[in-house]
Structure formats: structure tokens, C-alpha cells
């Protein structure tokens, strides 16, 4: 009898937890900005203009490992010594994948010559479920007169969206490892649907 009560209670707790979990909620997702690294994945500066020192690369790596890496990287990129380094002209696309639903692609551009461009138009999706099938794939390029340079592709998982929703503000998700440090962060604003 005690086992039945415990099993019944544990089953009720599991159902109750599942019903209130973020995986059953719907949100609006907005990608606000990206933070781009100092160099392309091959180590050359954007548009092959300027010189990026080994010290700059090491300092950026240290900033990426800081407790609040997004702030440390933003402060690092604002250093006057980096003003002479060419910055990319970001353009790209973001595609939302939801299980078997058709992909929902959004294209955008960033401000020219910026290490941390806001995206225009900002990719937005409404009524996005926070479940394991949800992911967003982002592909970025440095727009050039001839032959755009690949900045990188990264994936935003459902768990990343849930963390952004929990933060309640623009959440800077570190994506540097996915892109070989060519793209460092992506800004996500995830809010509950009314």
C-alpha cells in the first residue's frame, strides 16, 4: 500500500513538474546583435586590413574566459589600440527549425564596419515552443565588394533559448567555440507570448 501511495505521489509530481516546465511554454525570439572577433577563422584580419597582434588574440582569449565574458569582451573591443583594425560588414540569415515544421528563415544585415552590429531587420519568430526540437541555425558573412567572407555558422539550442528567457533581458550567448572565435556572442531576447 505504501508503494502505491509513493508511486502515485511521484507520478503526480512528475506530471505537475512537466506541466509547469519551460518546455511547454511559447515564446517570442529576437536575435538583436552579434559580437564578431578580431580575425577570420584563418587568422587574417577582416578585409586583410590592419595587423592583429598575437597579444591582442591572447587578450581576447582571456576576456572570453572571464566570469562575465560578454562584458569583458565588449570592454576589450572598445580599446583605442584596436581602432585601426578593419571591422566586418555583417550580413546573414537565421533559420528556425521546429521538429517536422518547415524551416522559417530570416535574412538581415548589421551596421557596416562594426565589431558588435545590431541586426536589421532583427530576426523575430513568434509562438516558438521551448522544447527539444527547437533550434536556430545562424550563418554570417562579411560583405565585400567581391566574394563575401564566411564569418561562421552556429546553432542556438532550445536550452540556450530557455536560459535567455529566464534572464529577462538581452542574453549574450557565447558561440565562440562553434565558430573558431570569428563570431563570439549572439544577443537573444526571448520573452513569453501573451
How would you label these PLM feature ranges?
Residues 25-27, 88-90, 132-134, 180-184:
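Residues at beta-strand starts and edge strands
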Residues 15-16:
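C-terminal motif of bacterial Sec signal peptides marking the signal peptidase cleavage site
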Residues 26, 120-125, 135, 168-170, ...:
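Intrinsic-disorder/low-complexity, polar/charged segments enriched in Ser/Thr/Lys/Arg/Asp/Glu/Gln
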Residues 20-91:
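C2/C2-like lipid-binding beta-sandwich modules
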Residues 78-163:
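Peripheral membrane lipid-binding modules
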Residues 34-37, 143-194:
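C2-type phospholipid-binding modules
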Residues 2-7:
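Sec-dependent signal peptide recognition
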Amino acid at each position: 500500500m505504501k508503494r502505491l501511495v509513493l508511486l502515485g505521489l511521484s507520478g503526480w509530481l512528475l506530471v505537475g513538474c512537466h506541466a509547469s516546465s519551460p518546455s511547454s511554454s511559447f515564446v517570442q525570439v529576437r536575435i538583436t546583435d552579434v559580437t564578431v572577433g578580431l580575425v577570420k577563422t584563418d587568422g587574417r584580419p577582416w578585409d586583410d586590413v590592419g595587423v592583429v597582434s598575437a597579444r591582442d588574440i591572447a587578450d581576447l582569449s582571456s576576456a572570453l574566459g572571464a566570469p562575465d565574458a560578454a562584458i569583458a569582451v565588449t570592454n576589450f573591443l572598445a580599446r583605442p589600440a584596436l581602432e585601426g583594425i578593419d571591422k566586418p560588414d555583417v550580413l546573414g540569415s537565421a533559420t528556425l527549425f521546429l521538429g517536422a515544421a518547415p524551416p522559417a528563415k530570416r535574412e538581415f544585415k548589421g551596421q557596416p564596419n562594426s565589431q558588435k552590429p545590431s541586426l536589421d531587420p532583427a530576426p523575430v519568430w513568434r509562438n516558438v515552443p521551448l522544447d527539444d526540437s527547437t533550434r536556430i541555425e545562424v550563418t554570417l558573412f562579411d560583405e565585400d565588394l567581391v566574394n563575401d567572407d564566411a564569418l561562421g555558422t552556429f546553432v542556438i539550442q532550445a536550452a540556450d533559448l530557455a536560459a535567455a528567457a529566464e534572464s529577462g533581458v538581452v542574453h549574450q550567448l557565447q558561440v565562440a567555440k562553434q565558430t573558431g572565435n570569428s563570431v563570439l556572442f549572439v544577443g537573444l531576447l526571448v520573452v513569453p507570448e501573451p
